[in-house]
Amino acid sequence: MKSITRRQLLKSAPAVIGALSVAELAAAQAVSPADSGKGPKVGLVTYMLAAEWDVPTIIANCTETKFAAVELRTTHAHGVEVSLSQVQRAEVRKKFEDSPVKLASLGSAFEYDSPDPAVLKQNIEGTKEYARLAADLGCDGIKVRPNNLQEKQGITKQQTITQIADSLTIVGRAAAGEGVEVRVEVHGGGTNRFPVYSAIMEQCQSPNVYVCWNCNDSDLEDGGLEHNFKLVADKIHFVHMRDLFVEEYPWRKLFELLAGTGYEGYCCAEIPASSDPLRVMKYYRALFLAYQNRL
């Protein structure tokens, strides 16, 4: 075996050190920003792309496309409803807990604007029952919505704002006892405008009621995106997103605003059905990351 002199060793040392530095740098760069765990995480609302999928299909497709979470919208083919028995609820919970896909939300259509006291009570009690379902499934939040102002019925805007806020206080307190958040989607005729929506949130007396940002055109009105975002920024706990190819919506600015609050929750795609859903989901995730410079 040929021996190496001290002089030869010293001469080659810088190259060895340099090679190690390059290797270490490459290793450090091997974890891409997309997989770092920092920043918002992409998810899916079953409305409407996954409306016809059962739970195993939802989990399989989200896993393949690297979607981190799902919101199960009520009435869809997954069948996750309050009618499930305790055994069935445990089975659904285990399916998600044994997968990389988080059951992040249950999407309801409960609303609190009706001038009919019986309808209002039905929605409040239904929300409480839905929160119990979420708790049984290991899901930490449910989506509800305002829906409409009732001025055509002779009811003032302020009366409806107060009624919705009071109802949210009731359901928020009830859901807190289940360990489940109530997330109010920015939605509805007039109630999706931020002077109205932010007033509802301000009047609600439950700290367990949060904002589900919904990426509406109305976000850009009444002072614009940044102004409206700041009105509710500290309460945003969930985000619904539509098609990211919609150029009229300032996606990069929204991601900047979310980053400014330290938001690392879920942004769930609420997009139309497709004959090639997995391809759509892969492109969606790529755009989602590209807008944040995380690719």
Language-model features and meaning:
Residues 13-21, 29-34, 56-59, 63, ...:
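Active-site acidic/histidine proton-transfer and metal-coordination neighborhood
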Residues 46, 74, 110, 146, ...:
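Residues that line or immediately flank small-molecule/substrate-binding pockets and catalytic motifs
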Residues 71, 105-107, 143, 240, ...:
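Conserved beta-strand positions in the central sheet of alpha/beta enzyme cores
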Residues 68, 140, 237:
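Receiver (REC) domain switch/active-site residues of two-component response regulators
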Residues 2-43, 50-65, 191-295:
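Histidine-acidic metal/acid-base catalytic patches
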Residues 48, 73-74, 107, 186:
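Residue-level recognition of beta-strand->loop/alpha-helix junctions
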Residues 81-85, 116-119, 154-156, 195-197, ...:
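Short secondary-structure transition/capping segments
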Residues 73-93, 147-152:
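Glycine-rich, proline-tolerant flexible connector loops at the mouths of alpha/beta enzymes
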